[in-house]
A protein has these predicted regions:
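Conserved PLP-enzyme active-site core in the AAT-like
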Residues: 6, 15-22, 89-206
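Conserved N-terminal alpha-helix of the aminotransferase class I/II PLP-enzyme fold
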Residues: 44-98, 128-130
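N-terminal glycine-rich, Lys/His-bearing helix-loop that initiates the first secondary-structure elements
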Residues: 5-61
């Protein structure tokens, strides 16, 4: 269903895509139906296992066995966001800050270090400055306008550079190309909170 929608508007402009992407040609509805379900019904345990195996082999989604793996509604949303961000895949979370938490903890482990832009969203600062140290993870805040200090603060323990562009508190813009270049040179992951930029103004992956 959503694949048809995505392919149909692949060549359209950003604004055209936003206006038409939600059309549900499969069910002939103006917008995809909102599916609210916690339990998915199957005819047998064998069918459940088949669906679970498909989900494992296809991490991009589209196969559901329980609410935690999403519904057809969340799948369509992920496909749309993937197109807007021009990314390989999008994984949705319950909250925006939940995605920040997931991005950080999917990379770092006890004993690691991360570098965070100084004008970062305050809850992100609280998380990285106060809570990460309980897991023996060190946070260093860097000046986004002095990237020489960013390079100097990278150590063999550094696993992630966390960026906001623009920054939440000051709305200053950072040189993403230079930051990514430094990260690649040192084999460090990068993550960005793109809340303010949105894919309309900023496509960090591109």
């Amino acid at each position: 269903m959503s694949t048809t929608v995505i392919k149909f508007f692949m060549s359209k402009s950003f604004r055209t895509f936003l206006k038409h992407t939600a059309k549900d040609f499969h069910n002939q509805s103006v917008n995809p139906p909102v599916v609210r379900a916690s339990t998915i019904i199957f005819k047998s345990m064998r069918e459940i296992r088949k669906m679970q195996n498909k989900a494992i082999k296809n991490p991009k989604g589209g196969y559901f066995d329980y609410a935690r793996s999403g519904t057809s509604t969340t799948y369509i949303l992920q496909k749309i966001l993937t197109k807007l961000e021009e990314s390989y895949h999008v994984f949705t979370t319950q909250t925006g800050f939940g995605s920040v938490f997931l991005a950080i903890f999917s990379v770092v482990r006890p004993g690691d270090e991360i570098l965070v832009a100084d004008p970062v969203y305050n809850p992100t600062r609280v998380l990285t400055e106060n809570y990460l140290k309980e897991f023996n993870i060190k946070t260093i805040f860097y000046d986004p306008h002095n990237l020489e200090t960013l390079q100097k603060n990278i150590t063999p323990k550094t696993k992630l550079i966390f960026v906001e562009n623009p920054g939440s508190n000051t709305f200053d813009f950072q040189d993403l190309n230079k930051i990514i270049s430094i990260a690649k040179k040192n084999k460090v992951y990068t993550a960005i909170d793109n809340t303010w930029g949105t894919p309309y103004y900023l496509k960090p992956i591109k």
